[in-house]
Amino acid sequence: MVKRHIGSWILVLFVVMWSDVGLCKKRPKPGGGWNTGGSRYPGQGSPGGNRYPSQGGGGWGQPHGGGWGQPHGGGWGQPHGGGWGQPHGGGWGQPHGGGGWGQGGTHSQWNKPSKPKTNMKHMAGAAAAGAVVGGLGGYMLGSAMSRPLIHFGNDYEDRYYRENMHRYPNQVYYRPVDQYSNQNNFVHDCVNITVKEHTVTTTTKGENFTETDIKMMERVVEQMCITQYQRESQAYYQRGASVILFSSPPVILLISLLIFLIVG
């Protein structure tokens, strides 16, 4: 009789446990995903232009209340009258007339960074995929990916991309997904840091990038950052589901009961 009651209680606990797990799986995921509302990325069809400005202020691509990519009356991607993707007259990615990436000086050239950095491939060899990269403020280096096949709308750019795609990154830098409110923010940050690091390390070796290279590199890195987000987000929710499963009261009670039966 006692064994029959124990078996009944175990059956009830299993039903409660799996009901709790089912409810956990049906809970909506937080944050806005890709094309699920909130801020969205701009269209892909515009030639040239830096689609990932690093300045704060207005909405996406609208710092200080300017039009799309036109803060303070600049041209397309030309805030304060700078050149292509040159806010405040600096080089590409040089806000306020800065020198190299992240440089505050006014005399350094974009293609002459003052502090050489380790090449991305060397970092990849030194650190396992997903490990924190030293000197990058908590960014991790993703695993290598195949560069996506992208069509740019004309034969010249399509051919140029096929011939030069080996010069563009095949890994991305990123922070953990739980540090971002949605996919757009993750991808924006991922693109900026990856293009920046790849550009600096490549120009240090004496190879420069044209405007066409930068445009294509952003498109390539964007697709890889989206893939990286999807991978990391899936892993994050799987870890969360495991924690919820093994920390739920029915599971704890069931484990305690099994231990009691085994020991007793």
UniProtKB/Swiss-Prot annotation:
Sequence repeats: 54-62, 63-70, 71-78, 79-86, 87-94, 95-103
Lipidation (GPI-anchor amidated alanine): A241
Binding site for Cu(2+) 3: H88, G89, G90
Comp. bias intervals (Gly residues): 55-105
Location of the protein in the cell: Cell membrane; Golgi apparatus
Pfam entry (one): Prion
Lipid bilayer topology: Lipid-anchor; GPI-anchor
Any one Gene Ontology molecular-function term assigned to this protein's record: copper ion binding
Propeptide section residues: 242-264
6 X 8 AA tandem repeats of P-H-G-G-G-W-G-Q: annotated segments: 54-103
Subcellular location, principal: membrane
Organism domain of life: Eukaryota
SUPFAM superfamilies: Prion-like
InterPro entries: Prion (IPR000817), Prion/Doppel_b-ribbon_dom_sf (IPR036924), Prion/Doppel_prot_b-ribbon_dom (IPR022416), Prion_copper_b_octapeptide (IPR020949), Prion_N (IPR025860)
Positions of region (Disordered): 27-119
GO biological process: protein homooligomerization
Glycosylated residue positions: N192, N208
A Gene Ontology term for the protein's cellular component: side of membrane
Binding of Cu(2+) 4, residues: H96, G98, G99
Record's function text: Its primary physiological function is unclear. Has cytoprotective activity against internal or environmental stresses. May play a role in neuronal development and synaptic plasticity. May be required for neuronal myelin sheath maintenance. May play a role in iron uptake and iron homeostasis. Soluble oligomers are toxic to cultured neuroblastoma cells and induce apoptosis (in vitro). Association with GPC1 (via its heparan sulfate chains) targets PRNP to lipid rafts. Also provides Cu(2+) or Zn(2+) for the ascorbate-mediated GPC1 deaminase degradation of its heparan sulfate side chains.
Disorder noted: Variations in PRNP are responsible of transmissible bovine spongiform encephalopathies (BSE), a class of neurodegenerative diseases that affect various mammals. These diseases are caused by abnormally folded prion proteins. BSE can be subdivided into at least three groups: classical, H-type and L-type, with the latter 2 collectively referred to as atypical BSE. Susceptibility or resistance to a BSE disease can be influenced by at least 3 factors related to the host prion protein: protein expression levels, number of octapeptide repeats, and specific polymorphisms.
Family: Belongs to the prion family.
Protein name, per record: Major prion protein
